[in-house]
Amino acid sequence: MKTKPFSQAALSLAIALALSACAAPKANPNLTLEATGQVMSTAETAERYDVNGNWWEIYQSPQLNALMEQALANNVDLKQAAISVNKALYQANILGADLVPSFSGSLGANASKNLKTGSHGNTFSSQLGLSYELDLWRKLSATADAQVWEYQATHEDMANTRLTLINNVADAYFNIAYLNEAIELAQKSLKQYQEINRIANAKFRYGRADSSQPTQAKQSLLSAENSLLSLQNNLDTQKQVLRNLLNLRPSENMAADPAQFRLLPVKGVNLDVPITVLANRPDLRAAEYRLQASQQSVNAQKRSWYPSITLGASLSTSSDKAKSTFNIPMLGGSATINLPFLNWQTMKWKD
């Protein structure tokens, strides 16, 4: 770096700051797709319809509410999705920092001694620097915007994970509730078949029926027993599915006793909803955001071939005495032009 007179260095610094204000628009964290007017936005959907994210609460079931609360607190997939959101936000903040000037500073002290003459000397120095890459082609902005889109996509991923978890827990609850009632009916039916089998055998013993009646009664009884056994096996499977969704250890209990699950009254569903609201599904929105992120990444990669200009300024001092280190500052400025297209053999493999 060459040392320049104070006025020239100050002028370079002023130009750098002025260009930074013009050439570095911030990445917009509120980028949306509703500007096209082709889909109904989330805000419009919420305004026109009664959108309740905790829809299961309309059933007013303490067991179902307790299960949902436990699932949302314990589920591993939901926690991993939250971590992904934080990582994407962290990366977006890092890339956004490239749009503003970066500062650096240092303090140094050096001591030396001549072993032959015994003389020694001390040197003290300090430096304050500023560096800024002009975003002339909006390469940095495109890179930052791509990460903002990715951050929004991870938000939708978490919303989709939450929605999937809620639906799976609700399915497991209603499956268990159905199986509980089906098993109760199957047990009552089994008792009836047992009584029919007893009567058929008694008739056969007293000669009031041929051998086919006890045989048919036994077959019906075995069929009822098999049906009951199948329902019980399905119930055990659904209970294990629910435990997995709740992320429970073998020693932990569910927030509600599955034996108490019962089918709930059917609630009315508003069917007068336009199909355009499907565009607000979290998985679809995540896919749309990632398409936008890919487009911005392509733009940034194309613009990486263009020349880049980096401006720098520094304020440095040096003295052989600590108390006079800051007495005689020297101001310097620099401008660096990078020509990446000259390294085309490497750049072409990155596209």
Positions of the model-derived regions?
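Amphipathic alpha-helical coiled-coil scaffold segments and their short linker/junction regions
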Residues: 57, 63, 72-74, 94, ...
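Outer membrane beta-barrel translocator domains of Type V secretion systems
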Residues: 104-133, 139, 143-149, 154-157
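Sec/SRP-type N-terminal targeting helices
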Residues: 80, 96, 134-162, 212, ...
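Short, acidic/charged, Gly/Pro-enriched secondary-structure junctions
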Residues: 79-97, 106-110, 292
